[in-house]
From Swiss-Prot:
Protein name (Swiss-Prot/TrEMBL): ATP-dependent zinc metalloprotease FTSH 2, chloroplastic
Entry's localization field: Plastid, Chloroplast thylakoid membrane
Binding-site residues, ATP: G267, P268, P269, G270, T271, G272, K273, T274
Membrane-spanning ranges: 168-188
Lumenal, thylakoid compartment spans: 83-167
Entry superkingdom: Eukaryota
Broad class of where this protein is predominantly found: plastid
Keyword entries, A-Z: ATP-binding, Chloroplast, Developmental protein, Hydrolase, Membrane, Metal-binding, Metalloprotease, Nucleotide-binding, Plastid, Protease, Thylakoid, Transit peptide, Transmembrane, Transmembrane helix, Ubl conjugation, Zinc
Catalytic residue list: E489
GO terms for cellular component: chloroplast; chloroplast envelope; chloroplast thylakoid; chloroplast thylakoid membrane; peroxisome; thylakoid; thylakoid lumen
């Protein structure tokens, strides 16, 4: 026999042995053997202790092997038993039995039920002369049949049914043993795996479906404090009061103040809502529960409401504490939209959440902190005082906030002397805290890839381009396509610069990024939340500049699909001017509910609530805005053909033109509107908000 070796690791020891073992067991007259060869050698200490998780995995592996061996044994036993008994469930007619008897194919006959049933052991030619056991229904035990059996010298015997009850019971137990063992083993596996496939309360343990999945930290060690949170000073101030109340409640109760029951964080993604919650846990030093809103909802009815009850029960037992619910819009969506019916699982869960929050007694010390970026779809009952007493807006930071955030994330990075965090903050309007962290991380990755010891301005520039527009592609070779893209991008820049109120050009490039073969970058205004009608209309003109350049330079038949992204943007902007901002001939009306802006179903319902005449007026107003902007773009291209040709010539040569160089060349041929003139020092490097040409 070939030798094999096995290495056993357990209780911190690595053991090798040299002994042979052989195990054997008889199953119904058949012998099944299991052999293993183990070599013995030296004992070496590998580890002082074994991790609990490895122990548990070892038990599960052992249980799986045990179940597998038991299954093999039972199958082997059943097969051997079946080979002995044959196919006793097969039936044979009485006439065929007599035919077999005449041809000497019957070996044995067992009679049951007073001779009315016979189990016959016969040789079947259809099965290659195999011996099979068949059941024959006899008309009665006749003397002629007995005499025939004696004459053929066939072994036959009569049996009482009571005598066979033991074997029937044994066969029944044998048939049920394997399923019972399998089910029991699976149950033990699910128990030992801590709740089965779904974890505690998951599908593996049905008894824990209604238990909360919230992560509980008695002494939270998130590693985050308010010093790590920058750019959201107003939100920090509100939460500092909450932390003070949890630490020193007597200071507030002495003057009759009550603890706020809930704080709702509202803001776009990446602005630091979850980071603020971690900072609260780190500062307060009280028990901290964290859970996602989606974990309340399951496929089974009532599970979500049960988990809400279980969560708040644990919170009250550990008060004072903080309960953080991330993405609460998953469970707090507005009710009564007609979607899912009155018994929708989300509505039941929301009803239970409202009840639990409103059922708190005064000053219990339990504060619910929730975060969402879809406050417009939350149920109004969830937002009233007494539930979420405070609503804190966490918006994208301003220049000062961006500078503070960059200082936090730049603490562990090395920069060249020419890198200024203040300049980076000025160049990144609209960036959230997560975007700024990603920006510096991308710059550090690029510096490492280029074998640099510190981050330079070049890495910062490339990182901004990469985050906003995507990965850099291969530059196009000279040809008609490259010339067309150059005219397209210069058309954007010229129409934008010559239209009063438009953002300043940052750079024009033919270097492809993402899906765009060329890009025109503009500097957004300092306050992106306040935009005038003139600025919006100028952006529509600038967006149509690429399409206008293609039509004027190459002819109407040569217009390409490169303006598809531009058309989508300017159509959406024009529709917003008409339906949301009231900047059209229809009048200062808000024709679209704010909650319908980000919800497809609500948008459809709002559209259906309009009259046909009003819908036609909206479409006409949108078309009028787009048509008038396109006429202006066409006139800019026609009146500045020489400037266009010169700019395209320089762009094809350099592949990238900076904003200052672009305006210097353009001003040689035409006058730039005073409001669009920009000091040269403000546009030395690219910023955000590109206008792509997806040719």
């Amino acid at each position: 026999m070939a030798a094999s070796s096995a290495c056993l690791v357990g209780n911190g020891l690595s053991v090798n042995t040299t002994t042979k073992q052989r195990l054997s067991k008889h199953f119904s007259g058949r012998q099944t053997s299991f052999s293993s060869v183990i070599r013995t050698s030296k004992v070496n200490v590998v580890k002082a202790s074994l991790d609990g998780k490895k122990k548990q995995e070892g038990r599960r592996d052992f249980l799986k092997i045990l179940l597998g061996n038991a299954g093999v044994g039972l199958v082997a036993s059943g097969k051997a038993n079946a080979d002995e008994q044959g196919v006793s469930s097969s039936r044979m007619s009485y006439s065929r039995f007599l035919e077999y008897l005449d041809k000497d194919r019957v070996n044995k006959v067992d009679l049951y039920e007073n001779g009315t049933i016979a189990i016959v052991e016969a040789v079947s030619p259809e099965l290659g002369n195999r011996v099979e056991r068949v059941r024959v229904q006899l008309p009665g035990l006749s003397q002629e049949l007995l005499q025939k059996l004696r004459a053929k010298n066939i072994d036959f015997a009569a049996h009482n049914a009571q005598e066979d009850q033991g074997s029937v019971l044994f066969n029944l137990i044998g048939n049920l043993a394997f399923p019972a063992l399998l089910i029991g083993g699976l149950f033990l596996l699910s128990r030992r795996s801590g709740g089965g496939m779904g974890g505690p309360g998951g599908p593996g343990n049905p008894l824990q479906f209604g238990q909360s999945k919230a992560k509980f930290q008695m002494e939270p060690n998130t590693g985050v404090t308010f010093d790590d949170v920058a750019g959201v000073d107003e939100a920090k101030q509100d939460f500092m009061e909450v932390v003070e109340f949890l630490k020193k409640p007597e200071r507030f109760t002495a003057v009759g103040a009550k603890i706020p029951k809930g704080v709702l964080l509202i803001g776009p993604p990446g602005t630091g809502k979850t980071l603020l919650a971690k900072a609260i846990a780190g500062e307060a030093g009280v028990p901290f529960f964290s859970i996602s809103g989606s974990e309340f909802v399951e496929m089974f009815v009532g599970v979500g409401a049960s988990r809400v009850r279980d969560l708040f029960k644990k919170a009250k037992e550990n008060a004072p504490c903080i309960v953080f619910v991330d993405e609460i819009d998953a469970v707090g969506r507005q009710r009564g939209t007609g979607i899912g019916g009155g018994n929708d699982e989300r509505e039941q869960t929301l009803n239970q959440l409202l009840t639990e929050m409103d059922g708190f007694e005064g000053n219990t010390g339990v504060i619910v902190v929730a975060a969402t970026n879809r406050a417009d779809i939350l149920d109004s009952a969830l937002l009233r005082p007494g539930r979420f007493d405070r609503q804190v807006s966490v918006d994208v930071p301003d220049v000062k906030g961006r500078t503070d955030i960059l200082k936090v994330h730049a603490g562990n990075k090395k920069f060249d002397n020419d890198v200024s965090l203040e300049i980076i903050a000025m160049r990144t309007p609209g960036f959230s805290g997560a975007d700024l962290a990603n920006l510096l991380n991308e710059a550090a990755i690029l510096a490492g890839r280029r074998a640099r010891t510190s981050i330079s301005s070049k890495e910062i520039d490339d990182s901004i381009d990469r985050i906003v527009a995507g990965m850099e592609g291969t530059v196009m070779t000279d040809g008609k396509s490259k010339s067309l893209v150059a005219y397209h991008e210069v058309g954007h820049a010229v129409c934008g610069t010559l239209t009063p109120g438009h953002d300043a050009v940052q750079k024009v490039t033919l270097i492809p990024r993402g899906q765009a073969r060329g890009l025109t970058w503009f500097i957004p205004s300092d306050d992106p939340t306040l935009i005038s009608k003139q600025q919006l209309f100028a952006r529509i003109v600038g967006g149509l500049g690429g399409r206008a350049a293609e039509e004027i330079i190459f002819g109407d038949s040569e217009v390409t699909t490169g303006a598809v992204g531009d058309l989508q943007q300017i159509t959406g902007l024009a529709r917003q001017m008409v339906t949301t901002f009231g900047m059209s001939d229809i009048g200062p009306w808000s024709l679209m509910d704010s909650s319908a802006q980000s919800d497809v179903i609500m948008r459809m319902m709002a559209r259906n609530s309009m009259s046909e005449k009003l819908a036609e007026d909206i479409d006409s107003a949108v078309k009028k805005l787009s048509d008038s902007a396109y006429e202006i773009a066409l006139s800019h291209i026609k009146n500045n053909r020489e400037a266009m040709d010169k700019l395209v010539e320089v762009l094809l040569e350099k592949e990238t033109i900076g904003g200052d160089e672009f305006r210097a060349i353009l001003s040689e041929f035409t006058e730039i509107p005073p409001e669009n003139r920009v000091p040269s020092s403000t546009t030395t490097t690219p910023a955000s908000a590109p206008t792509p040409a997806a040719v």
